[in-house]
Amino acid sequence: MKATLRTRLDGFQERFEELAALLAEPDVIADQARFRDYSREYAELEPLIEAWRSYRRTEDDLEAAEQMREDSDPEMRELAEEEWREAQARLEALDADVKRLLVPRDPDDASNVFLEIRAGTGGDEAALFAGDLFRMYSRYAEKVGWRIEVINASHGEQGGYKELIARVRGDNVYARLKFESGAHRVQRVPATESQGRIHTSACTVAVMAEASAVGEVELNSNDLRVDTFRSSGAGGQHVNTTDSAIRITHLPSGLVVECQEERSQHKNRAKAMALLAARLKQSAVDAQRQQQADTRRSLVGSGDRSERIRTYNFPQGRITDHRINLTLYKLGDVMAGELGEVIDPLIHEYQAEQLSALQAS
């Protein structure tokens, strides 16, 4: 392990021990705000420090076994050789654990998200693919125990969606889905294609962390215009005789959100406000990432919806993620919800990228 990482880890251990002492002080215990903040920091550091301490102990075990390998007794040397191999294997595993835990956690990783899917180039075929993508995400959500609900949907004429917005709730949703933002391209033969020609169409996906607290995004009522209208279903027919659907316009930014999935105007308004807060938060994040993109590549992207990230080739059963040159011939499995096959390599690459930046700093 590099000396720079060791120095950083020793610093974290000193802070961890300092926090343990602070949490035992009566004046800190009496101050709920300080006690809560210190407890949170302590809990965040604890897994890293435990792994680092285990790493240091295993280094000592390895050194002891190394010395025993020089023993004059053949049986002792054989025993030492076995202990050395075991210690070496443990050290390699702990090295990976420490580095993984050292990567700074995105503060939004534990957040729920709003998932937007929009049909792009390709007309009806793009809308059908938007429906396929939503089913893929829904099946993945079911597999990992998340809950998904549609906030707003505009149906395609031949099926699928022109646009769909869903809220996804569960453990570490943003941590798993944040790499999905961008342009998703599909190559396949449409059902209406009599010549068997492959068509290319695309959808854009945006993943926005839900604002976790009311005060995280400031929404001034004077900056909002709220309109009501009747909900409509597929084909434009009205499905509700009351003006329960809500459209909110954020006047300073021009952002517009709608929600019409609930029969209650109150519920639609609450969901629309949550979506607006998430979009405003995402706008600020995108601006920050755009600045970062000028200096380094980021797998999360700059927030540009046109950034092509993935191709789904149905004739070949192939899915390719262009950011990490990942190609899998498991398209059927991925579309059936085995999205972890793509997400996990992206997370590993992102963590390696973050660790490299840490080592260079």
Curated annotation (Swiss-Prot):
Gene3D superfamilies: 3.30.160.20, 3.30.70.1660, 6.10.140.1950. InterPro entries: PCRF, Pep_chain_release_fac_I, Pep_chain_release_fac_I_sf, Prokaryotic/Mito_RF, RF-1. Methylated by PrmC. Methylation increases the termination efficiency of RF1. Keywords: Cytoplasm, Methylation, Protein biosynthesis. PROSITE patterns: RF_PROK_I. One of its GO terms (cellular component) is cytoplasm. It comes from the Bacteria. Signal peptide: none annotated. It is found in: Cytoplasm. One of its GO terms (molecular function) is translation release factor activity, codon specific. Pfam families: PCRF (PF03462), RF-1 (PF00472). The keyword rRNA-binding does not apply. SMART domains: PCRF (SM00937). The modification N5-methylglutamine is found at Q237. Belongs to the prokaryotic/mitochondrial release factor family. Peptide chain release factor 1 directs the termination of translation in response to the peptide chain termination codons UAG and UAA. NCBIfam families: prfA (TIGR00019), PRK00591.1 (NF001859). This is Peptide chain release factor 1. The gene is prfA.
